[in-house]
């Protein structure tokens, strides 16, 4: 008989420490926690096998294909410093294993089945290197950072946003009123909350209409281009596209999607529609913490961020470093660069396991949102730089004098920080002083500073 039946060790076939990675390979870095007694090589090889061509036993149809051409290979294993039984396993996948232009297929292959594998106690995908050949099969963001600035005619500063609260329960007319007040006060964008879709108290079409009215009114009065992220997320792809079409008919500049709950397939369709029809696309990452919060199991957010850049989105929420949600500064800045820059060098101190070349795929603006207020402005300006969107929900609507003064306070604080930075002042050291000086000529800012002077989200 030509083949030997039975179960065999994965490491015989899938652990190849002398393999030279190809420029066309997709490379993955997995944090592997093997079950007690399972050697790291076997665990790493098992990951490579289960996420590519392997199955648990030898099958005779293996003889009909060229395994060496199609198998994933675990080509390097290193222990994790400070962790007893954790290893980083590096796996190389041949490009032919993946459908072109499909983030869905890429994830189904790489993280589809292997996470339930018995030989592993836990598994986390830390990073992916997307080869140039594969990047080129994706459209990516509908427009990207530069085109967005040109469309909005806003340069040399971060953009300001605000999520309309209370997130659920307002009627469409009152919702539109809140949008108008924020935009009129000086924000660039307002935002539908991620769970505002089309509920009994406010159907999507009514909301779209009143928000468009608010936007045009604020635009006429301020002479600035304004936007409201109209959430097109829906229960079916057809309904989602219907909402995007209506937004386009209203002539608004931007729509929004929840890319993880909505799914990569729907998201990529929407991104194509947005590019074809001149709409910007704001992406919210609802559900990400389910996937990325555990340190030893799941997928790191930097991988979800890379996937979004491939699937398509012009903005994506990416933590604040300073607000109420978790995020370590260097690590956050690592994936912020992965979103914005064209070429990112490997840098383990920032969590970047591979050098990534995006070959001019448009960039994505990172959005800082969640528990931030005027006192954070110097830090945010310093950390995120100009190419970002800073979103203050409660930090605008919680202003004691109302929404418009709340918006004024944020805009004044931002302009003061940008001016100070341009004059060469050190925002990290003089931040509080810069905000205090600005308070002198903005009563709105002074009132905001008073309200939030004691708030800290430190746990």
Swiss-Prot record:
GO MF, one example: monooxygenase activity
UniProt cofactor(s): Mg(2+)
Swiss-Prot/TrEMBL site (Transition state stabilizer) positions: 324
One GO cellular component term noted in the UniProt record for this chain: chloroplast
Residues binding substrate, per UniProt: 113, 163, 167, 285, 317, 369
Record note on cofactor: Binds 1 Mg(2+) ion per subunit.
Record note on modification: The disulfide bond which can form in the large chain dimeric partners within the hexadecamer appears to be associated with oxidative stress and protein turnover.
Domain of life where this protein originates: Eukaryota
Keywords assigned: Calvin cycle, Carbon dioxide fixation, Chloroplast, Disulfide bond, Lyase, Magnesium, Metal-binding, Methylation, Monooxygenase, Oxidoreductase, Photorespiration, Photosynthesis, Plastid
Subcellular compartments: Plastid, Chloroplast
Enzyme nomenclature, EC number: 4.1.1.39
Keyword Hydrolase assigned: no
GO-annotated biological processes: photorespiration; reductive pentose-phosphate cycle
Residues where Mg(2+) binds: 191, 193-194
Chain positions with N6,N6,N6-trimethyllysine modification: 4
Residue numbers of N6-carboxylysine PTMs: 191
Catalytic activity: 2 (2R)-3-phosphoglycerate + 2 H(+) = D-ribulose 1,5-bisphosphate + CO2 + H2O; D-ribulose 1,5-bisphosphate + O2 = 2-phosphoglycolate + (2R)-3-phosphoglycerate + 2 H(+)
Subunit structure: Heterohexadecamer of 8 large chains and 8 small chains; disulfide-linked. The disulfide link is formed within the large subunit homodimers.
Further remark: The basic functional RuBisCO is composed of a large chain homodimer in a 'head-to-tail' conformation. In form I RuBisCO this homodimer is arranged in a barrel-like tetramer with the small subunits forming a tetrameric 'cap' on each end of the 'barrel'.
Record's function text: RuBisCO catalyzes two reactions: the carboxylation of D-ribulose 1,5-bisphosphate, the primary event in carbon dioxide fixation, as well as the oxidative fragmentation of the pentose substrate in the photorespiration process. Both reactions occur simultaneously and in competition at the same active site.
Protein name: Ribulose bisphosphate carboxylase large chain
UniProt source species: Heuchera micrantha (Alum root)
Taxonomic lineage from the root: Eukaryota, Viridiplantae, Streptophyta, Embryophyta, Tracheophyta
